[in-house]
């Protein structure tokens, strides 16, 4: 290990100017934050200078004595390509091959040895190391490079590392490095000093478009701008596009326009060999164009690039908590991402950056990208935390706390997969890992896929699960427009393996092989049982078991959503399917099938008899039948396989369901007749007059939400429950409401607000209590009041009634609360008119001395 070469080979890099400051800071602080612009050399240089400081024992107390000669530095990189290139560059500086002093570990690939002192890792590798050994024995320092990307794995790895540092390894050093991060927040959280590299990048000219890029014409607009840049500028071009599809379309257009120019795609699914070709220097005298996803944003140096063309778009994986599906969305990049991309043009010399958006719209872009942990599927994260030994994820020292709702969903999924078992503590998010969960956590894949791979002890079924897992992880080699038959793809994969002619199946075959190594099983290319494929998929995605609802391609899934499969698809003819991959747009809460634009991509037939079904009672309110539905059902999730009526359902359950239905739709469930409304008005009137009586609220607005307090007592009669609206409408609601009141209040209300009053004619006339009116109303024919000297009252004489005096034809002729004054004055005018209209009736000149009558009297 020749560390003297560091200054010779990399001393010119701007980051070398802060190397001593970094080592000095690590003597005083456990944590450190470093910022440096793109191209400063922080990723390739600083790990080496820290290692040199350790080897020279320049950092007194940096590590425990027993680690001084063997403590490793682990540096995390977000992407595999960057990890490989950085390791190769550091090894080159030392004049050594990769795998000696400098090594790397990425998924399914590693180059390390017993002599390795610096390991460049992708983030999932560190998480696995922490889970397997929380002490990180033999490790002195962790470096989180390009931390501004805030991937879910980097946030998790940092949280676990901080927990280790706080509880077990106070000597462990944590370093955060980035070019575009808000360092103040990180420094405060980690109580870490900040060291900034003030070096300047080479000048970069920025050219903005006159309009924002059309998302439906990304390849076309990018190709046009690349051609413009190729004609107007010199040197190589690095173009950023959102995804592989746009790259392939743009490449096709450019090969027609610039046929003599080397064009290289660069994205994650490419083989390492093709990725190395893309980042290698162009041939002398030739120019090249690299079409890349955000994989080339950070850490990578592509020699010869002086021109950047930026679409301003990227793919973002978004988790939909409603459906449990994650899907890719094409979104605008943030300003810090734009800065990173622009910086690719000024790493070696001055450059030019073409931006396919206007300068005005740039101000609308968010300054920083959101941490992935805020809208990601947290299932793997929660399982890793449980395997680490922490049952309550929210207690870890997070920089950004994961959303509680997504944590709950993740734990529910893991419990359904038997990876976690609930703790007794119901007041916090908690779940202990099971033996099966521990096995799942050892596999570098989503818990769903891990569940599928460990579900059987049969080597042939495990081998089949490995093939399925590999197919699900990689882009479908047959394309999305082909038949959705998963078994067909598996057969083609196995056939290609047998013929040693993998071609487009090569990457999938490699992943399947790595999984088989982990499970210690051999390759199996035997014929495939399609229903076994479906059964394995159902283990991974139990909520995506689907049952045909018609013969037109409509299916209902066990999570309640509906999907559509093209009737021409071979899988559409099956009654039962297990869905491995689907377009989010194809899910719907409607069974009509209208408006669906997506479809199922991968599926397999499944025998429902081999799936775990549950027998349960379904007691619910049927809004169509307007009655309680009482069935014993055999179910797979929302799919009903068998249903039988229940004769003697639990009475309390039935009662609660009716009360809940009443809360939502009680106005139409009971007979709210005029008598009920009059009672409610009368009771409310007394409550208004006498609040000291504390009369219960009998208003409909109060009764329906509180139905559980008064309704259950009347739902059973003769040992039989009333379960339908027809039966409920027969309830005497007036009697029920009156009985809500204690007996003493009933007596008081009858005294203060009688329902009727006797008038001189002998008739009992009903009093109309109208809450909010001037006074209760007594509507009575004028002739029946002859001889009544004063206005009748209620409320123990405190409230005169409002008399609505009527003609013999029951038409109002006068309103008054002063009957005595009426007899002395207005009566004579009214008498004249009534005498003319009703000549057969008796209209005396002295009504106070006349006998009240009900009908005609002369």
Could you describe each region identified by the protein language model?
Residues 29, 351, 463-466, 532-534, ...:
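Active-site lining segments that contact anionic ligands and/or coordinate catalytic metals
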Residues 44, 253, 259-260, 265, ...:
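Second RecA-like catalytic domain
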Residues 194-197, 553-558, 753-760:
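Short acidic-hydrophobic surface loop/beta-edge motif
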Residues 201, 562, 763-765:
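Short, solvent-exposed loop/turn motifs
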Residues 343, 578-604, 779-802:
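Short, solvent-exposed cationic patches
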């Amino acid at each position: 290990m020749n560390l003297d070469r560091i200054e010779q080979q990399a001393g010119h890099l701007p980051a070398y100017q802060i190397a001593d400051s970094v080592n000095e800071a690590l003597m005083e602080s456990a944590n450190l934050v470093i910022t440096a612009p793109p191209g400063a050399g922080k990723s390739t240089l600083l790990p080496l200078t820290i290692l040199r400081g350790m080897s020279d024992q320049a950092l007194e107390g940096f590590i425990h004595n027993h680690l001084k000669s063997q403590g490793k530095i682990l540096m995390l990189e977000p992407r595999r390509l960057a990890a490989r290139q950085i390791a190769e560059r550091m090894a080159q500086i030392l004049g050594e091959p990769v795998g000696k002093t400098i090594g790397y570990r990425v998924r399914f690939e590693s180059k390390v040895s017993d002599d390795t002192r610096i390991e460049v890792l992708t983030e999932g590798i560190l998480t696995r190391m922490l889970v397997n050994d929380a002490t990180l024995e033999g490790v002195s320092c962790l470096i989180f490079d390009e931390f501004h990307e805030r991937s879910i794995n980097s946030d998790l790895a940092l949280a676990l590392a901080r927990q280790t540092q706080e509880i077990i390894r106070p000597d462990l050093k944590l370093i955060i490095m980035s070019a575009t991060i808000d360092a103040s927040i990180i420094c405060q959280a980690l109580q870490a000093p900040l060291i900034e590299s003030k070096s300047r990048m080479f000048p970069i000219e920025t050219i903005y478009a006159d309009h924002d890029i059309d998302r439906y014409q990304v390849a076309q607009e990018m190709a046009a701008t690349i051609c413009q840049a190729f004609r107007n500028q010199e040197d190589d071009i690095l173009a950023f596009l959102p995804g592989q599809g746009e790259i392939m379309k743009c490449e096709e257009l450019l090969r027609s326009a610039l046929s003599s120019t080397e064009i290289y795609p660069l994205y994650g699914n490419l083989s390492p060999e093709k990725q190395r070709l893309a980042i290698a220097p162009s041939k002398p005298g030739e120019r090249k164009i690299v079409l890349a996803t955000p994989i080339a944003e950070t850490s990578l140096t592509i020699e010869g690039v002086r021109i950047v063309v930026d679409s301003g778009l990227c793919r973002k994986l978004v988790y939909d908590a409603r459906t449990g599906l994650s899907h890719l969305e094409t979104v605008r990049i943030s300003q810090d991402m734009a800065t990173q991309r622009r910086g690719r043009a000024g790493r070696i010399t001055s450059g030019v950056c073409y931006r396919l958006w206007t300068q005005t719209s740039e101000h609308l872009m968010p300054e920083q990208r959101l941490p992935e942990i805020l809208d990601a599927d947290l299932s793997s994260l929660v399982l890793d935390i449980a395997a680490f030994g922490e049952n309550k994820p929210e207690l870890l020292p997070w920089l950004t706390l994961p959303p509680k709702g997504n944590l709950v969903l993740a734990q529910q999924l893991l419990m359904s997969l038997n990876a976690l078992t609930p703790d007794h503590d119901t007041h916090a998010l908690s779940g202990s890992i099971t033996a099966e969960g521990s096995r799942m956590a050892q596999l570098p894949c989503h818990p769903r896929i891990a569940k599928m791979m460990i579900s059987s002890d049969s080597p042939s079924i495990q081998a089949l699960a490995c093939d399925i897992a590999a197919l699900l992880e990689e882009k479908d080699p047959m394309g999305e427009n082909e038949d959705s038959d998963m078994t067909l793809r598996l057969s083609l994969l196995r056939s290609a393996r047998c013929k040693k002619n993998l071609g487009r199946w090569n990457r999938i075959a490699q992943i399947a092989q790595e999984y088989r190594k982990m499970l210690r099983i051999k390759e199996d290319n035997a014929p495939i049982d399609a229903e076994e494929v479906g059964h394995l998929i159902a283990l991974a995605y139990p909520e995506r078991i689907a049952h045909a609802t018609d013969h037109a391609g409509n299916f209902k899934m066990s999570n309640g959503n509906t999907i559509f499969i093209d009737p021409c698809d071979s899988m559409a003819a099956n009654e039962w399917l297990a869905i491995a991959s689907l377009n989010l747009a194809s899910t719907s809460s409607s069974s009509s099938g209208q408006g669906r634009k997506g479809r199922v991509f991968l599926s397999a037939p499944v025998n429902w008899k081999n799936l775990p079904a549950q027998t349960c009672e379904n007691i619910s309110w049927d809004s169509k039948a307007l009655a309680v539905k009482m069935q014993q059902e055999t179910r797979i999730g929302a799919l009903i396989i068998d249903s039988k009526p229940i004769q003697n359902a639990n009475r309390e359950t039935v009662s609660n369901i009716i009360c809940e239905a009443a809360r939502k739709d009680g106005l139409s469930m009971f007979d709210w007749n005029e008598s009920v409304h009059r009672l409610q008005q009368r009771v409310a009137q007394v409550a208004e007059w006498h609040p000291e009586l504390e009369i219960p609220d009998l208003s409909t607005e109060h009764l329906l939400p509180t139905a559980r307090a008064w309704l259950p007592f009347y739902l059973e009669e003769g040992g039989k429950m009333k379960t339908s609206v027809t039966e409920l409408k027969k309830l005497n609601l007036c009697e029920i409401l009156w009985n809500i009141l204690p007996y003493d209040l009933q007596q008081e209300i009858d005294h203060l607000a009688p329902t009727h009053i006797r008038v001189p004619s002998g008739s009992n006339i009903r009093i109309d209590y109208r809450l909010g009116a001037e006074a209760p109303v007594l509507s009575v024919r004028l002739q029946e009041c002859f001889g009544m000297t004063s206005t009748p009252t209620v409320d123990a004489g405190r409230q005169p009634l409002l008399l609505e005096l009527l003609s013999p034809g029951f038409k109002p002729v006068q309103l008054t609360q002063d009957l005595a004054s009426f007899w002395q004055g207005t009566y004579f005018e009214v008498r004249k008119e009534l005498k003319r209209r009703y000549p057969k009736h008796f209209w005396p000149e002295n009504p106070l001395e006349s006998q009240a009558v009900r009908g005609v009297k002369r």
